[in-house]
Swiss-Prot record:
The active site is at D486. GO terms for biological process: triterpenoid biosynthetic process. Coiled coil: none annotated. PROSITE patterns: TERPENE_SYNTHASES. This is Beta-amyrin synthase 1. It comes from the Eukaryota. It is an enzyme of class 5 (isomerase). Pathway: Secondary metabolite biosynthesis; terpenoid biosynthesis. NCBIfam families: squalene_cyclas.
Length: 763
């Protein structure tokens, strides 16, 4: 059976190491010797069966395998009776308390031994196939993914095939050439024949590809991976010159000015392009060359398909100026750089590029910044030295990305351990049930303290285009190493709240110096407009977004300011100022003033805020209202709050909830869920946003209606049902945060019970 392991390394693996003894690490292992009881196996198979039956209705999985494991290991039984509130009944204090206690006890049972909450964070369907392709090329596929792994990877691909035969950019998306081609190749590498797979998956996928222009219409990232694999020619890709990494730093397009994820993708990509690396041409590769195209492979005019992209994949059409730039590099520059004496310059550029790759790998303990970058960096290390330690260290960290659910095996974006735990802890603290939660809170506090980044990147980090990280929290764990402003703000908030509580209940409070380091991170990331960047200070100009080389993302070339990061930081610094009023007071006051101005400036005409990391206007509005309320802005003294309240009240549905489609994110306008369905996570966000605004004092009726929906939606064991996907990044790609369905209904009910006057049965 599959088992989730927590905070485990391998003492016998010289290529695996950690900065804090693997706190937060979560890895899946298949134990062939543990067969489990018939009841355990039945639970798992039933979860798989139900997902398969409902996969077109609810596309994100319930993340049930590890939940079943944890609840079984802890002998969890929900002993608090369930409550329902009738249509003509008022929500009482007792009903809210009972529902909250049931949710709190269930959620506490899901806590891992090191104090964090594990969870799937996946959904994009281009994450896993490149890893399979990389392992196939390097000859490590069978050792990294033996039979049971392959079985689960194929299950995942089958589960998320669309009814038209293709695969979406993410699990809820329409079919795209990029992910259909990658999924088809992945199935073939894993042993399926051209017409194999469940429900003729391969034949249906290949038909979709050929019906939509064949693999020549794959977008740029697809062209790169297909070229690497040997089923496409590098001549059909736009240039990615590694000389970019030796440009003078004063140039506006210097890598130091790029968004870190963009920089980290094109760093190893440019190395592989500069080498024109192609994997071994095996019989399977020759077959794929025949299967993926509508014409013979050797008759394709590769130079003419560089700019070709299927219409289904285009979110960001390239402007003419960008195509002219690539054409100039393709026609003029590349022929020179591959010939003497200019090839000496290319050799230097390749060496510099790999120097940066190794630096980033070492400073993330070979996790790297994310899954797309992980696979590219790993392959670049193998191309440089197939038997080298760099590649072996990469292999040791593959398990950090693998996740198993009832829908199969997938690749995480990377872990969300700190992110989910920070919000989960705040939800539990808001419940005012501390006396029932002591061990849970103490473990959570311990995890957060141990996960703070204690050092900056190594050496002369500024010359490697890195920002300070000392005092930050990452999205996942300490080993990951990459500072994030909102993760830092949420971690800081937790530690500040814990510092006001009895140590015998929640453990020793964090040293002030460590808190000061966190404040320093937040202050360092504010832009002139008052907004907060996520990873690094904004240093580049917006016009550089014209050079966005992808077709399916927006706003990826440079760092930007974000509503959520700004609002989180306001809340953290307001609380910090109360507890440490003498530390950098003037800077913090200025920060808050400018941050409020930013939130007011970027509010949408309808009163909402665009959410960059969640769906979408509901999410952004919850954050913004929380930030404004923390800074003393109210319905009475702030027009932005009044407009936001009107937006939320107008978008409330007949059943009392809120439900927003993921389509709001790419379209940048509010789109309700099909059929005006409610989503419990969205309902939690909206309910908390209204509570922040003081809605209870004006008219609590909308709050009671929302709370009634949450109470009546709770399941028998205290869980809440999995519904639509709720996370997003770069405007157009969705992320499944599997614990959101627990955290936000729980948190919203906690705030409701705490801050909204309710009738009591006793009265």
């Amino acid at each position: 059976m599959w088992k989730l392991k927590i905070a485990e390394g391998d003492k016998n693996d010289p290529y695996l190491y950690s900065t804090n003894n693997f706190v937060g690490r979560q890895t899946w292992e298949f134990d062939p010797d543990y067969v489990g009881s018939p009841g355990e196996l039945e639970e798992v198979e039933e979860a798989r069966r139900q997902f398969g039956e409902n996969r077109y209705k609810v596309k994100p999985c319930g993340d049930l395998l590890w939940r079943l494991q944890f609840l079984r290991e802890k002998n969890f039984k929900q002993t608090i009776p369930q409550v329902k509130v009738g249509d003509d009944e008022a929500v009482t204090y007792e009903a809210a308390t009972t529902t909250l206690r049931r949710a709190v006890h269930f959620f506490s049972a899901l806590q891992a031994s090191d104090g964090h909450w594990p969870a799937e964070i996946a959904g994009p369907l281009y994450f896993l196939p490149p890893l399979v392709m990389c392992l196939y090329i390097t000859g490590h596929l069978d050792t990294v993914f033996p039979a049971e792994h392959r079985k689960e990877i194929l299950r995942y691909i089958y589960c998320h095939q669309n009814e038209d035969g293709g695969w979406g950019f993410h699990i809820e998306g329409h079919s795209t050439m990029f992910c259909t081609t990658l999924s088809y190749i992945c199935m073939r590498i894993l042993g399926e024949g051209p017409d194999g797979g469940v429900n003729n998956a391969c034949a249906r996928g290949r038909k979709w590809i050929l019906d939509h222009g064949s693999a020549t219409a794959v977008p740029s990232w697809g062209k790169t991976w297909l070229s690497i694999l040997g089923v496409y020619e590098w001549m059909g890709s736009n240039p990615m010159p590694p000389e970019f990494w030796i440009l003078p730093s004063f140039l506006p397009m210097h890598p130091a000015k790029m968004w870190c994820y963009c920089r980290m993708v094109y760093m190893p990509m440019s190395y592989l392009y500069g080498k024109r690396f192609v994997g071994p041409i095996t019989p399977l590769i020759l077959q794929l060359r025949e299967e993926l195209y509508a014409q013979p492979y050797n008759e394709i005019k590769w130079g003419k398909v560089r700019h070709v992209c299927a219409k289904e994949d285009i979110y960001y059409p390239h402007p003419l100026i960008q195509d002219l730039l690539w054409d100039s590099l393709y026609v003029l520059t590349e022929p020179l750089l591959t010939r003497w004496p200019f090839n000496k310059l290319r050799e230097k550029a390749l060496q510099t590029t790999m120097k940066h790759v190794h630096y980033e790998d070492e400073n993330s303990r070979y996790i790297t910044i994310g899954c797309v970058e992980k696979v590219l960096c790993m392959l670049a290390c193998w191309v440089e030295d197939p038997n080298g330690d760099y590649f072996k260290k990469h292999l040791a960290r593959i398990p950090d990305y693998i996740w198993v659910g009832e829908d199969g095996m997938k690749m995480q974006s990377f872990g969300s351990q700190e992110w989910d735990t920070g919000f989960g802890i705040q939800a539990l603290l808001a419940s005012d049930l501390t006396h029932e939660l002591g061990p849970t809170l103490m473990k959570g506090h311990d995890f957060i303290k141990k996960s703070q980044v204690k050092d900056n990147p190594s050496g002369d980090f500024k010359s490697m285009y890195r920002h300070i990280s000392k005092g930050s929290w990452t999205f996942s764990d300490q080993d990951h190493g990459w500072q994030v402003s909102d993760c830092t703000a949420e971690g800081l908030k937790c530690c500040l709240i814990f510092s006001t509580m009895p140590e015998e209940i929640v453990g020793k409070k964090m040293e002030p110096e460590l808190l000061y380091n966190s404040v320093n991170i937040l202050l360092s990331l504010q832009s002139k407009n008052g907004g907060l960047a996520a990873w690094e200070p904004v240093t580049a100009q917006d016009w550089l977004e014209l050079l966005n080389p992808t077709e399916f993302f927006a706003d990826i070339v440079i760092e930007h300011e974000y509503v959520e990061c700004t609002a989180s930081a306001i809340q953290a610094l307001v609380l910090f100022k109360k507890l440490y009023p003498g530390h950098r007071k003037k800077e913090i006051d200025n920060f808050i003033t400018n941050a409020i101005r930013f939130l007011e400036d970027v509010q949408m005409p309808d009163g909402s805020w665009y959410g960059n990391w969640g769906v979408c206007f509901t999410y952004g509005s919850w954050f913004a209202l929380g930030g404004l309320a923390a800074a003393g802005k109210t319905y009475d003294n702030c027009a932005a709050v009044r407009k936001a309240v009107n937006f939320l009240l107008e978008s409330q549905l007949d059943d009392g909830g809120w439900g927003e489609s993921y389509l709001s994110c790419p379209k940048k306008v509010y789109v309700p869920l099909e059929g005006n369905r409610s989503n419990l996570v969205h309902t939690g966000w909206a309910l908390m946003g209204l509570i922040h605004s003081g809605q209870a004092e004006r008219d609590p009726t909308p709050l009671h209606r929302a709370a009634k929906l949450l109470i009546n939606s709770q399941m028998e064991d205290g869980d809440f049902p999995q519904q639509e996907i709720t996370g997003v990044f770069m405007k157009n790609c969705m992320l499944h945060y599997a614990t959101y369905r627990n955290i936000y209904p729980l948190w919203a009910l906690a705030e409701y019970r705490r801050r909204v006057p309710l009738p009591s049965l006793g009265a």
